[in-house]
């Protein structure tokens, strides 16, 4: 394809809305705009317009030049997707034509992170470069079908790429990136805090958190202060979540724990500064329920950028890098995670030695979104 990613009109298709919490698709949109492209971030569609008309608005996002947010509501029933998919896609093609017209003309690149097959590549007219970028595990045929028609596929795990071998498009591993807000902060010399501060960031309304193991660790470590960033109410989340009684009970237990602080969602730049205060980080997902199946997580790069030790459930992408992450070996349970946490915290000076902190920071800096775009550009 021999494409450069400068001076292009790019449509980013995201299954998560723009908001306080940022994931890969949000960071790629920002970095592409900084690189001199006109970038349009397509939010998931809102509820159907009962007046029978498409509602489309395009507003500037102030975080980068020439970065635009597309808010839209379809004029046909969304439930058609589940009962009459060919008709849904036919109507969606018409809707997308209106979106492209509202943008002001054809786009040069369609960059899709969508696993819901809302907008098959064949619905777009012209000859844009079609990039498919799944960052979560494809759990059903709909997610696999979402890659059909792509010119090239990128993913953050080799396991995900293997599932798209059914298509002729070449697939390439590109690790999660780290945003400029994190990589630009120079870590200072570390001194252990009293009490030790352990950081956790993410969406705490997700159903794949291993709440039992996490609460056990918190209870068994009363001398450690656990600081949580991210949504703990579904209403505050722009990246999904669940509001079932089990999650509500989990959040209440966190709120009532004397060694827990819930900060809620904050902007990336502020989060970067807060994470640098930490002595260590904890990741605790149930791999069997996890949307990434314990293969990779976006937050890992952000944690590594601080240089501090990470204690985690098993993550296959880093299984051969104990210098980067201290993880358990088991894939079917986290029963040994509390013991691992205790062992690492007990020897935190060793795990946060200068050489290890420098290695973690160096790894993160080699995976900035700017560098990931350079790698992607070389493959186009």
Predicted segments — roles?
Residues 19-23, 269-274, 283-304, 311-322:
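Nucleotide-sugar-dependent
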Residues 190-209, 214-221, 226-229, 365:
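Conserved donor-binding/catalytic core segment of Leloir-type glycosyltransferases
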Residues 332-335, 349-380:
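A charged, aromatic-enriched C-terminal amphipathic alpha-helix characteristic of glycosyltransferases
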Residues 36, 279, 307-308:
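A short alpha->beta transition loop at the rim of the catalytic pocket in nucleotide-sugar-dependent
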Residues 141-144, 178-194:
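Acidic anion/phosphate-binding donor-loop and adjacent secondary structure
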């Amino acid at each position: 394809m021999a494409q450069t990613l400068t001076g292009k009109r790019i449509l980013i298709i995201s299954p998560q809305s723009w908001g306080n919490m940022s994931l890969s698709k949000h960071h790629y949109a920002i970095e592409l705009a900084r690189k001199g492209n006109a970038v349009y971030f397509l939010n998931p569609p809102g509820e159907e317009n009962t007046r029978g008309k498409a509602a489309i608005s395009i507003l500037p996002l102030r975080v980068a030049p020439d970065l635009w947010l597309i808010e839209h509501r379809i004029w046909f029933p969304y439930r058609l997707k589940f009962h009459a998919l060919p008709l849904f896609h036919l109507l969606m093609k018409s809707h997308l034509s209106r979106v492209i017209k509202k943008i002001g003309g054809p786009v040069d690149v369609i960059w899709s992170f969508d696993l819901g097959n809302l907008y098959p590549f064949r619905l777009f007219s012209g000859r844009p470069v079609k990039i498919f970028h799944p960052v979560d595990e494809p759990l059903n045929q709909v997610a696999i079908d979402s890659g059909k028609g792509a010119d090239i596929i990128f993913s953050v795990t080799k396991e995900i790429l293997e599932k798209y071998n059914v298509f002729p498009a070449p697939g390439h591993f590109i690790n999660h990136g780290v945003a400029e807000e994190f990589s630009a902060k120079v870590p200072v010399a570390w001194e252990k805090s009293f009490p030790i501060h352990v950081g956790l960031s993410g969406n705490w309304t997700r159903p794949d958190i291993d709440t039992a193991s996490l609460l056990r660790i918190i209870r068994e470590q009363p001398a450690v202060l656990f600081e949580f960033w991210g949504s703990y109410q579904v209403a505050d989340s722009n990246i999904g979540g669940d509001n079932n009684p089990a999650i509500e009970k989990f959040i209440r237990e966190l709120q009532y724990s004397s060694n827990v602080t819930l900060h809620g969602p904050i902007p990336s730049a502020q989060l970067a500064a807060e994470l640098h205060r930490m002595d260590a980080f904890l990741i605790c997902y149930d791999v069997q329920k996890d949307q990434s199946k314990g293969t990779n997580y976006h937050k890992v790069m952000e944690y590594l950028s601080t240089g501090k030790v990470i204690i985690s459930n098993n993550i296959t992408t880093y299984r051969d890098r104990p210098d980067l992450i201290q993880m358990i070996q088991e894939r079917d349970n986290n029963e040994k995670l509390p013991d691992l946490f205790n062992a690492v915290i007990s020897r935190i000076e060793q795990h946060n030695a200068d050489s290890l902190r420098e290695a973690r920071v160096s790894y993160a800096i080699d995976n900035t979104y700017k560098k990931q775009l350079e790698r992607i550009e070389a493959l186009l």
